[in-house]
Amino acid sequence: MADINLAQLLDAGVHFGHKAYRWNPKMFPYIYTERNNIHILDLVQTAQLLKRANAYVQNAASEGKTFLFVGTKRQASAVIAQEAKRCPSGYYVNHRWLGGMLTNWVTLKSRIERLKTLEQQEVEGVFNLLPKKEASLRAKELEKLRKHLNGVKDMSKLPDVAIIIDQKREMTAIQECRKLGIPVISILDTNCDPDLVDIPIPGNDDAVRSIKLILNSLTNSIVQGCQ
C-alpha cells in the first residue's frame, strides 16, 4: 500500500476548502487556517485519514468484501466509473442516485433484471421485429436504465462498503447506508458533517485532480487486497 505524501496532496489542491461562510463547524478540527476567506484543510490529517481508509479497504478487499463508489457530480462522474471498474469487487453510481437503491433492494433488483432482459432482446434483434413505436419505447427505456444502473448491473447483493464523493449532494445515499449499517468512506469538504461517515477524508471534493488522487489511492489498496 503506497501512501500519498503531502506534496502530492498539495499539488492536487486537496487542501482548498470552501468559502469560510459556508463551513460546517464540525469540520473545525480538520481546518488548518483561513486565507482570503477560503478555508484551508490540514493535509497532515488528510494524509493520516487516507492512510487509515486505505488500510481499511485493503483489509476488506482481502476478506472478499464488495465496494460501491458513488459520485454523480460532473467532476466525479467519469473518475468514479473508471476507478470502480479497476476493482474486481467494485460497483458504481455516477449519474443520479435513485432513492431506495439500497433500502428498497428488491425493487432495484427487479429494475436490474429488466435492464438485462432488454439488453438480451437488443442483442437478439428482438427490437427489429417490433412495431416502430414499441421498438422506440424499449430503446429509450434501455438507454435510461443503462444510464442509471449500468454500474450496479452485476451487483448481486448489498455492498459491504460505500465510497462517496460529495456528502452534501449524495446525502440520500449516505442516509441509506447508515440505515443499513454499510460503512461509509467519504471525501469531506469544509461544508460537510464528519459525524455522518465512518472514515472521513478531509479534502477538496470539487476539483477533479483532488478527487482522482484520493480515489486512485483507495482503488490501488482495494486491488492489492484482492490479490
Swiss-Prot record:
Compartments in which it is found: Plastid, Chloroplast
Domain of life per record: Eukaryota
Biological process, per Gene Ontology: translation
Matches recorded under Pfam families: Ribosomal_S2
Keywords per UniProt: Chloroplast, Plastid, Ribonucleoprotein, Ribosomal protein
CDD domains: RPS2
Gene Ontology cellular component annotations, sorted alphabetically: chloroplast; mitochondrial small ribosomal subunit
Keyword Chaperone: no
Any one GO molecular-function label of the UniProt entry: structural constituent of ribosome
Main location: plastid
Matches recorded under InterPro entries: Ribosomal_uS2, Ribosomal_uS2_bac/mit/plastid, Ribosomal_uS2_CS, Ribosomal_uS2_flav_dom_sf
Record-stated family: Belongs to the universal ribosomal protein uS2 family.
Designated name of the protein: Small ribosomal subunit protein uS2c
Organism phylogeny: Eukaryota, Sar, Stramenopiles, Ochrophyta, Bacillariophyta
Gene: rps2
